Amino acid sequence: MLSPRRVKFRKQQRGRMRGIATRGNTIAFGTFALQAQECGWITSRQIEASRRAMTRYTKRGGKIWIRIFPDKPVTMRAAETRMGSGKGNPEFWVAVIKPGRILFEIGGPEITEELAKEAMRLAQYKLPVKTKFLVKEEQEAAVEATAQTAAVES
């Protein structure tokens, strides 16, 4: 499972998830992608389960890119421990997800849209956030259309 090799600080505060993703929100490597529609934490186990589901369905054809990395430690206290005496130990790692973030990409000559859609659907079931299937050409056309409307307005 994914986790950082070494970190500057072992423990982190939980933080807040506000706003939308400004980075990692366009398809960069593959032809098809899975985009988050809401915010949340995705654990390294969930990422691995999604990756395995997609790989198994595509029969190892094409290539899968994981666009998120679990770099936030989540700490937990031992069961039946009294209050106080410091923060618990890191138990697992999560990736903080904002709406619009690309989670997975898939591509290759043997990957059709139907195959990619079904593989992404199987991965979707393993994730705790709502997601949306994207096609690179459609996303590029949408970005171009918004750029043209912005140019006309100004």
From Swiss-Prot:
One of its GO terms (cellular component) is cytosolic large ribosomal subunit. One of its GO terms (biological process) is translation. Pfam families: Ribosomal_L16. Keywords: Ribonucleoprotein, Ribosomal protein, RNA-binding, rRNA-binding, tRNA-binding. Transmembrane segments: none annotated. The keyword Cell division does not apply. PROSITE patterns: RIBOSOMAL_L16_1 (PS00586), RIBOSOMAL_L16_2 (PS00701). CDD domains: Ribosomal_L16_L10e. The keyword Manganese does not apply. SUPFAM superfamilies: Ribosomal protein L16p/L10e. GO terms for molecular function: rRNA binding; structural constituent of ribosome; tRNA binding. InterPro entries: Ribosomal_uL16, Ribosomal_uL16_bact-type, Ribosomal_uL16_CS, Ribosomal_uL16_dom, Ribosomal_uL16_sf. Gene3D superfamilies: Ribosomal protein L10e/L16. HAMAP family: Ribosomal_uL16. NCBIfam families: rplP_bact (TIGR01164). Part of the 50S ribosomal subunit. Belongs to the universal ribosomal protein uL16 family. Binds 23S rRNA and is also seen to make contacts with the A and possibly P site tRNAs. This is Large ribosomal subunit protein uL16. The gene is rplP.
